[in-house]
Swiss-Prot record:
Belongs to the class B bacterial acid phosphatase family. It comes from Salmonella arizonae (strain ATCC BAA-731 / CDC346-86 / RSK2980). Binds 1 Mg(2+) ion per subunit. GO terms for cellular component: outer membrane-bounded periplasmic space. This is Class B acid phosphatase. It is found in: Periplasm. Its EC number is 3.1.3.2. InterPro entries: Acid_phosphat_B-like, HAD-like_sf, HAD-SF_ppase_IIIB_AphA, HAD_sf. The active site is at D69, D71. Substrate binds at T137, G138, K177. Mg(2+) binds at D69, D71, D192.
């Protein structure tokens, strides 16, 4: 009888251990959820392009005026905006309406901004083509500015190709960049925000999206490709 009891106990123990092992196998860990080839292969239906493809699409076309947004398009300028928020309005975005912040940002704080590699490639390409380069930003205008010189120096833009930065400002309910794209006869406009792409579309010109870096202070991140526009690969840096 004792042997039978021991045997039954052993069977129960094995069953319990086996059940526990199966539970561990069949219950995925929330810490390590894993993935599969279908998820890895999943891509957003976006019109991706490279700088080389953009250059190829311009083959045979004469020099033209091209435009760039500045913040998160050609410069990772979050350090200056981060400093501005901490200095002028730690608990809100009111610093963006403060002229004192813009005086600082437009007169030296871009020394802390990091030029984006995709911007180097694009600007180099347009300089080789002989295009006229404009920078149209939503920043507020100030009495003086060093942004033009900073951009020309960082991206080695010859004086023949460079134009003074256009400070379009920000007005509620109005896309302030449209009038400048039209006035300067800009044919291609690069930008990271939805306003950049819609401004180009409203002007009937080619709008090309540059990805905003994930660690930008400008949140939320836009949905690149949401308007069917071209989006440059690896353009977040």
């Amino acid at each position: 009888m004792k042997k039978i009891t021991l045997a039954l106990s052993a069977v129960c123990l094995l069953f319990t251990l086996n059940h526990s092992a199966n539970a561990l196998v069949s219950s995925p860990s929330t810490l390590n959820p894993g993935t599969n080839v279908a998820k890895l292969a999943e891509q957003a239906p976006v019109h991706w392009v490279s700088v080389a493809q953009i250059e190829n699409s311009l083959t045979g076309r004469p020099p033209m005026a091209v435009g760039f947004d500045i913040d998160d398009t050609v410069l990772f300028s979050s350090p200056g905006f981060w400093r501005g928020k901490k200095t002028y309005s730690p608990n809100s975005d009111d610093y963006l309406k403060n002229p004192a912040f813009w005086e600082k940002m437009n007169n030296g704080w871009d020394e802390f901004s990091i030029p984006k590699e995709v911007a180097r490639q694009l600007i180099d390409m347009h300089v080789r083509r002989g295009d006229s380069i404009y920078f149209v930003t939503g920043r507020s205008q100030t009495k003086t500015e060093t942004v033009t010189n900073t951009l020309a120096d960082n991206f080695h833009i010859p004086a023949a190709n460079m134009n003074p930065v256009i400070f379009a400002g920000d007005k509620p309910g109005q896309n302030t960049k449209i009038q400048w794209l039209q006035e300067k006869n800009i044919r291609i406009f690069y930008g990271d925000s939805d306003n950049d792409i819609t401004a180009a579309r409203d002007c009937g010109i080619r709008g090309i999206r540059i990805l905003r870096a994930a660690n930008s202070t400008y949140k939320p991140l836009p949905q690149a490709g949401a308007f069917g526009e071209e989006v440059i690969v690896n353009s977040e840096y």
